[in-house]
Structures are given as structure tokens and as C-alpha cells.
């Protein structure tokens, strides 16, 4: 089995508690040589280390408990640290569906060196899969989610992906021009999963989706449809994006859409 994990901490049983994300990141940044499964020092560690030192360290939320859950996509075993204490620390059905689609359509999507931003990345599964497929990924979410997100990204991509994912704060609809100026940031794909549910920020979410979409940008959005407000959002989405239903997953009530921003 091909496992894409840092040797700093090997995966344990499903549901086994893990150490603090911040503590693991600090240990990685001290420069201890990385070893392969035979105990040999990896030659690539010197190339990765400068990137680690340049990372912004996000302080993890101190949830009472974490569990680790095992997934397999793109030929890799992926271990995600999750907590049921936060919506943003759990892998939801839309993320699973989107990962499945990315895996099954990898050749068509051609993520190799593509610039990708994920909205509402949560614990990071979708961003990890996109990174494994070769993309340059920026994973975004609210501040309290970023510590665990960064932990999972580094844990599953360090030394086994072409590009180390970046983590950035993104509050929907706020400071977009300042934090993501169009002159400096262009994305081939914008990814989102289960970002639409019963909350009060749907208009700001749509504003953010529109802002991040430039000519040539493809938005892939997977969502479990639970409430009437989900369909109301979809109607608004279709007004500003040329929308294609790419896949449906009846067992989980997830629909996956492709959106291209309308420019006329």
C-alpha cells in the first residue's frame, strides 16, 4: 500500500487520539532529518526544509479530542485528523464525492502544476488529493480551522508531492481585494465542497466564488443538498455561472457542479 505520510508520526488505528497539530509542525520545522521506511535519511529533506521555514504557523484550536480517519484516493492512503467539535474539522460527504471525481477524471482535469484554491477546506482532504495529483494548492478557511488544516496538509503531502500546499485565511466576502488581488492571484480551478448549508453567509460565499473566478477559471462545487436554502443558492449560482451538473451521488444526496463565470 502506498502511504503518503510524514515519518514524524505513523498512522495508528481508526479513532486513535493524536498529538497537537502545532506541536508536530514545530518539530518538523526544527530541521530534524527525515527518514524513509528503512530508517535512511531522505535526500529531498534539504529541499523541503526552506519551504517549511517560510510557512506561517497557525495555532490549532484546542479541541478536547481528535481522531484520525483513513481515506484512500489517487493511489495514496491519506490520514486526516478530525474533531466532531467543529464543522470545519470533519470530512463531509461533498468532500468525499469531489475527491472521487478528481481521482476518476485526473487525466481530463490535468491538475499537473495547475493553480488551485479551495474554499472552506476544513480538514483538508480535497486539497491533499489535488496536491497528490500535482496541483499548486492554496487551501483556505476561517482562522480557527487553519491549525488543523495545515497539520493535515503537511502530514500527507510533505516529501511526496511536487508542490507544498499553502494555507491562507479566507473569510467569505471580506478583504478579497487586499488578500487576493486579481493582479497577483489567478486560479485555474476553484474547489468547494459542502460549503452550502444552513448559515447566514450564502451571499458572501457567492460573492467570493465570483471574485475568485477569472477568465479560464473552472469552479468545481460538490454539495449535499439538505435544505430548501441549498436549492435557492443553486438558483443564484446559475444566474452568474454557466453551470453543468457533472455527477450525482444518490446514496449521499450529493450533486457536483462545474461553474464558469458568465462574462456577458
Swiss-Prot record:
Major location (coarse): nucleus
EC number assigned by the record: 2.1.1.-
Catalytic activity: L-lysyl-[protein] + S-adenosyl-L-methionine = N(6)-methyl-L-lysyl-[protein] + S-adenosyl-L-homocysteine + H(+); N(6)-methyl-L-lysyl-[protein] + S-adenosyl-L-methionine = N(6),N(6)-dimethyl-L-lysyl-[protein] + S-adenosyl-L-homocysteine + H(+); N(6),N(6)-dimethyl-L-lysyl-[protein] + S-adenosyl-L-methionine = N(6),N(6),N(6)-trimethyl-L-lysyl-[protein] + S-adenosyl-L-homocysteine + H(+)
Binding site for S-adenosyl-L-methionine: 92, 120-122, 141, 172, 193
Keywords: Cytoplasm, Methyltransferase, Nucleus, S-adenosyl-L-methionine, Transferase
Listed InterPro entries: Methyltransf_16, SAM-dependent_MTases_sf
Self-association state and partner proteins as the record states: Interacts with members of the heat shock protein 70 families; these proteins may possibly be methylation substrates for the enzyme.
Role noted for this protein: Protein-lysine N-methyltransferase using S-adenosyl-L-methionine as methyl donor. Mono-di and trimethylates 'Lys-943' of AARS1.
Family that this chain belongs to: Belongs to the methyltransferase superfamily. METTL21 family.
UniProt-recorded name of the protein: Protein-lysine methyltransferase METTL21C
Organism field: Homo sapiens (Human)
Amino acid at each position: 500500500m502506498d502511504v503518503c505520510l510524514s515519518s514524524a508520526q505513523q498512522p495508528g488505528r481508526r479513532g486513535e487520539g493524536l498529538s497537537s497539530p502545532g506541536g508536530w509542525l514545530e518539530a518538523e520545522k526544527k530541521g530534524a532529518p527525515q527518514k524513509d521506511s528503512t530508517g535512511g535519511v531522505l535526500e529531498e529533506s534539504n529541499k523541503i526544509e526552506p519551504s517549511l521555514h517560510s510557512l506561517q504557523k497557525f495555532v490549532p484550536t484546542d479541541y478536547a479530542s481528535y481522531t484520525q480517519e483513513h481515506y484512500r484516493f489517487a493511489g495514496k492512503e491519506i490520514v486526516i485528523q478530525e474533531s466532531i467539535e467543529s464543522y470545519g474539522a470533519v470530512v463531509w460527504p461533498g468532500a468525499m464525492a469531489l475527491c472521487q471525481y478528481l481521482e476518476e477524471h485526473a487525466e481530463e482535469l490535468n491538475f499537473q502544476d495547475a493553480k488551485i484554491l479551495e474554499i472552506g477546506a476544513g480538514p483538508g482532504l480535497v486539497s491533499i488529493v489535488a496536491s497528490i495529483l500535482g496541483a499548486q494548492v492554496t487551501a483556505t478557511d476561517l482562522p480557527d480551522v487553519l491549525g488543523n488544516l495545515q497539520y493535515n496538509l503537511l502530514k500527507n503531502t510533505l516529501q511526496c508531492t511536487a508542490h507544498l500546499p499553502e494555507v491562507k485565511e479566507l473569510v467569505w466576502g471580506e478583504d478579497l481585494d487586499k488578500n487576493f488581488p486579481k493582479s497577483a492571484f489567478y486560479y485555474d480551478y476553484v474547489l468547494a465542497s459542502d460549503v452550502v448549508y444552513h448559515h447566514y453567509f450564502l451571499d458572501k460565499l457567492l460573492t467570493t466564488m465570483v471574485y475568485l473566478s477569472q477568465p479560464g477559471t473552472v469552479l468545481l462545487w460538490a454539495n449535499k443538498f439538505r435544505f430548501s436554502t441549498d436549492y435557492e443558492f443553486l438558483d443564484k449560482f446559475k444566474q452568474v455561472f454557466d453551470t453543468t451538473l457533472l455527477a450525482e451521488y444518490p446514496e449521499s444526496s450529493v450533486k457536483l457542479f462545474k461553474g464558469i463565470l458568465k462574462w456577458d
